[in-house]
């Protein structure tokens, strides 16, 4: 088996190296071209050893020896950054001031509502029932419920011309009769006003002429 390599050279001579049974022999061969060729003779059993000697490997590597770790190209100098520990957030002074201001507003609102309730009940700052120490405690005795009660307005019932037409609780009123008619029959007919007296016979209007125009006395 032969392996030939052609390294570039400017000289016209070439160096031929041959390895036979582990010994290296050099032969100088003059050639007309400028590319010397290295010929290597080896059998199939020693071919691997010869290739390792030519490539620079000092000793063949055993199959059980661990392989060196391979690093991908461009990532050999990659360093894992340290994990940043989460630090507790510090509340700014503005947010703390806002919470304090809102808390003071709520307390002032609560105190003002309490004082107003006591004043409505009939007791002010000079009342014996008013005590600055017991502002947080409100008992029913401190409040005057009759004075706090609001009178609901009374809505008058709408009445008709007869005085009892608009009372829905009166069984004889037209409203109750209308409701009963709708509940029984599903409809209710209102009576139409009559302009003429009921005793007189209604007047009939002729729809067609009674006499013929040919029999008129003018002709």
UniProtKB/Swiss-Prot annotation:
One Pfam family it belongs to: VQ
InterPro entries: VQ, VQ_4/11/13/19/31/33
Positions carrying Phosphothreonine: 155, 196, 211
Motif VQ mapped to chain: 47-56
GO cellular component terms, semicolon-separated: nucleus
Keywords recorded for this protein, A-Z: Nucleus, Phosphoprotein
Chain positions found as Phosphoserine: 59, 65, 127, 131, 139, 141, 152, 192, 195, 212, 216
Region named Disordered: 52-94, 156-177, 190-219
Changes after translation: Phosphorylated on serine and threonine residues by MPK6.
Major subcellular site: nucleus
Localization, UniProt: Nucleus
Function, as annotated: May modulate WRKY transcription factor activities.
UniProt-listed PANTHER family: VQ MOTIF-CONTAINING PROTEIN 11-LIKE, VQ MOTIF-CONTAINING PROTEIN 19
Entry protein name: VQ motif-containing protein 19
Species in which this protein is naturally found: Arabidopsis thaliana (Mouse-ear cress)
Lineage: Eukaryota, Viridiplantae, Streptophyta, Embryophyta, Tracheophyta
Gene: VQ19
